Structures are given as structure tokens and as C-alpha cells.
């Protein structure tokens, strides 16, 4: 199986030993504590599950600035975005041991324990520098920029011990998986070549066929459909609805034992190219050999070029930095001429009128009225689940 990023073995920061974990939970109740923001809590969950291997905790300011600038820590570890705990809390001292409380669960239970190695102030200029490097914009209308700029100006760095996986395990018991669990499941399947498909949206015909194309062209053993379960921007479809629609699609339209449907506990960054590279890092940690990167991967609005998330792998990711390979996909759509889903670049003789194309707004309006999109665009079983959801909103 492909090695994890940056090490020979996966190093999840969740405390798996039950006795030790219970002792730490008891200790945490005696420690000074801070309430994390959602971004720092999501980072803790990802660190706990081994997704951000080989990191051992939150980055310090020097590493955060270096990673933002050139995707490498001060010591040379390749990593695409800073993994930080930035807060507005005061009174924390370097050398202290603190409990980190979960902002996303009732009662704010303890999520992790942190050994604080450094407490550093982050200037507005440094926030601006990092935001521009990560998101390629400083527009506060960009949801990632808005979130990053509001995180606080005190950066806490140091190793953490993760004690639970927040709400993800309880709310999505059949879907949430750690990188450790996914690697184990891939091994149990006996898969050697595995293609990952990232999604924060429901999957329509084009997405379904894209997974199939990648699997066939790469002669892969299986596909990992890996959905984001954390916070999105307003208007995006909730995870439970996406989960149900994707599972129905896989059940009806894919051969048995060729697809794993799982999810991960992270908030969407909308960082386009940089987030695509982060997706590659943690899919390698999951045991995947390939990641599908399509048009406007991890993007939002018009902030990124259609294929910036592909070209970053050629132009900015050093050779050998990742073992995982990228499957570069063009925009896919149903061809009326060929009666199948195709990549647009593969059919230069087609005009736009030869494809079944619908905007997201048009699809939402149809589903909200109980009208199914054309079967060339969306499977009827998927459309039914989405239509039921949209009609509850309109009601």
C-alpha cells in the first residue's frame, strides 16, 4: 500500500488506548481550557484521524508563514496550508497544558489536550500575507477569506492528544471514517490502486461517470467517494442529504465492492488550488493512489481559473513531494450526439448545444417544484432524495 505522506507509518493523534484516554479525559477536567473556533476544532479532528500526517499538532507562526508562502515548513516538510489554532482567548502561557473545548457540540465537551509550546501574536499584515497566498484573494466576500480573517490574532502551537471526533462520529456513524480506518478497509478489500473522488455536493450523472472513467482508464481496483461532513457556506446541501443521495446512486448504479462511500470531519476552506493539494495529501494518508481533480476543484464563485487546481500540481508541487498521482478531468456532461456522458475535451466536434447542461440554480428550482431534472443529468433516485429535501425548505 502507498505510504502515508511524510512518514513510513500513519501517526494519528487520537488516543486509541481506552485506559489512557479515560485518564486524559479526567485530567482535562482539571486543566485550564479554551473554546476552539470551528476551524481549529476541525483541524483537531483531522489530526486525530491521521489525515494530516505527519503533523503532531498545530503549527507555529514561522511554519504557518512558510507553508503559506511556499508550501513547506521551516524544516522542509511539504504541506499545502497552515494547520493552526488561532484564538482570541487571553491568559495562555507557553509551557502550559490546556484542554481544548468543542464549539460544535452542546455543552462544549473537551475535544483534545494541548501542550502549548508557543503563544504568538499574529499581525494584520501576517494575516493578509497568509490569506492572499492560501486563497489568492483578499476579498472578504470569499467565504474562506472571511473565516480566516476572523479566527483571532493569538496563535497557539504545539502537540495535541485528541480524545474524540466531535459530532462527526455520532451524527454520521455509517459514513465518518478516519484515515486509519480507510487504510484498513482498503487493505481488507485487497485493493492496490484506489481513486479518490472529493465531493461537497450531491453527485449527478457527470460525477458518477467521471468516477467510472477514472477507474477504467487507470485500471483501478476501487473508488473512494469521500465527502466533506463539516461546515459549508450557506445554501450548500447538508451532509445527511448528500450522503443519502450518494449511497443510493452507488447502490443502484455501481457493481458491488467497487466503491467505498465515506466522509471526513473538516470545514470547507474554498481555497481552490491549495485545497486541492491538501486533498491530495490526506487522500494519500488514506491509502489512495490517485485523486480526481476536475474543473474548479474546491473553488467558489469566480475566484479561480477553471483548471488552476490542476496546474498547481505541475507548477508549484515539487517532484517527489507526493506519491499520489492526480487524475486530471475536464468538465463532463451528457452528449446528445453520443448518448453518454463524456469529457468535453474528448469531443471537439461538439457545440455547447450538443450537451445537456443545467445551472445549479435551474436544478434547485426544478427540484424545489418537484420536477425531476432530465435523466441524462441526474439519476431519478438521486433526484427524488434531493427534491424531497428542497420541498421541505420551500414548505
Positions of PLM-derived features:
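Active-site cores that bind ATP or allylic diphosphates and position pyrophosphate for catalysis
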Residues: 1-395
